[in-house]
A protein has these predicted regions:
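Intrinsically disordered, low-complexity linker/terminal regions across diverse proteins
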Residues: 1-281
Length: 281
C-alpha cells in the first residue's frame, strides 16, 4: 500500500536499525559509589549522586550511541527511536522467552515475537515520525501517511471493542503503538518461523500439537498473568500496553495462519470477520 519512494525509505530505516544484544561492549565503572551494609538510604544517595555526575559528564560531548539505557540483567527489551536501535539484554534471553532446549516453534513464538515487536516499533504511530538516523523528520509522502493513519485508526477501533471487565474496554488510542507492535511482531516471527525446517513441517506433532499450534501457544505462554480487578481498572487507564489477554487474542484474531492452525470457524468465541481484521505491516 506504500509508494515505492516511501517503501524504500522504510527499508533503509529497517536495515539501519542498530542491534544491541546481551550486554554492552563497554562496562560502566561504579568504583566511586560508596556502598555500606545496613545503610539503605545513604546507599541510595550515593547511587543518585553517582548518576548525577555521570549525566553531567556528558555535557558538551558527542552523544555516545553505544550506551545502554538498561542493565544486562534486566528482563526487558526496547526500541529507542532517537538511536533507531533495538536492545535485548541477557535478562530476557532465557525461559520463557528463549530456551536452548526448546523447539523452534517455542522460541520463535517467544523471543521471536519480542524481537519482531521491537522492530515494528520503528514503524508504529510514534516511530514512524523518526528517520533512520533517529531524527524527527518526515519521510512519508502525504498520500502514504494518510493511508497509514487510516490503517492505524482501524486498529484503534478494533481494540476499543475488546472488553476487559464488565463495561471496561481496552483504550485503543492509548495502546495503539503497542498494539501495532504486537500485531507486527507476531507476523514477523511467524514469517521467520516458516523459513525453518520445523516451520515447514505440517505433519510432526509434539505433545499432540502441530508446529503452528505450538508457535501460537508459545506466544500465549509469555503473557500469562494473574491480576486483581482493581489493578486491571487502573492498568487500562494508564498503561500504553493492552492487558495480557488482548496482547495475545487481539493479534491472533487478525492473523490468518492462526485460524488455520486451530480451525477457528464463524461462531467460535474468538472468530473475527475478515473485514474487521487489521494489518498494517
Amino acid at each position: 500500500w506504500m509508494s515505492d519512494s516511501t517503501k524504500q525509505k522504510a527499508i533503509d530505516k529497517l536495515y539501519a536499525i542498530t542491534k544491541k544484544i546481551g550486554y554492552p561492549d563497554k562496562w560502566r565503572n561504579y568504583d566511586q559509589v560508596q556502598i555500606d551494609k545496613g545503610k539503605y538510604f545513604e546507599n541510595l544517595l550515593s547511587l543518585d549522586q553517582n548518576q548525577y555526575q555521570y549525566e553531567l559528564a556528558k555535557l558538551n560531548k558527542p552523544v555516545d550511541r553505544t550506551e545502554w539505557e538498561t542493565t544486562p540483567s534486566t528482563v526487558t527489551a526496547y526500541y529507542n527511536p532517537s538511536f533507531n536501535e533495538i536492545v535485548f539484554p541477557a535478562g530476557i534471553l532465557q525461559f520463557p522467552y528463549f530456551d536452548f532446549a526448546a523447539d523452534d516453534a517455542i522460541n520463535y513464538g517467544g523471543i521471536g515475537m519480542v524481537i519482531g515487536h521491537e522492530m515494528t516499533h520503528a514503524f508504529d504511530d510514534q516511530g514512524a515520525q523518526f528517520d533512520k538516523y533517529g531524527n524527527v523528520k518526515n519521510w512519508w509522502t502525504k498520500e502514504d501517511y494518510e493511508k497509514f493513519r487510516a490503517k492505524t485508526q482501524r486498529v484503534v477501533d478494533l481494540y476499543n471493542t475488546f472488553t476487559v471487565l464488565d463495561t471496561v474496554h481496552v483504550k485503543g488510542a492509548l495502546t495503539l503503538g503497542e498494539n501495532t507492535a504486537d500485531n507486527g511482531g507476531i507476523a514477523i516471527a511467524y514469517d521467520a518461523f516458516k523459513m525453518t525446517p520445523e516451520g515447514q513441517d505440517t505433519v510432526t506433532r509434539i505433545n499432540g500439537f502441530t508446529s503452528d499450534q505450538r508457535f501460537y501457544l508459545s506466544i500465549a505462554r509469555i503473557w500469562r498473568v494473574k491480576t486483581r480487578d482493581a489493578y486491571m481498572r487502573m492498568y487500562v487507564n494508564t498503561n500504553p500496553h493492552s492487558p495480557a489477554k488482548w496482547r495475545v487474542n487481539g493479534p491472533c484474531m487478525s492473523a490468518a495462519p492462526w485460524y488455520k492452525a486451530f480451525n477457528v470457524q464463524p461462531g467460535d468465541s474468538n472468530y473475527l470477520p475478515e473485514d474487521k481484521r487489521v494489518k498494517i505491516w
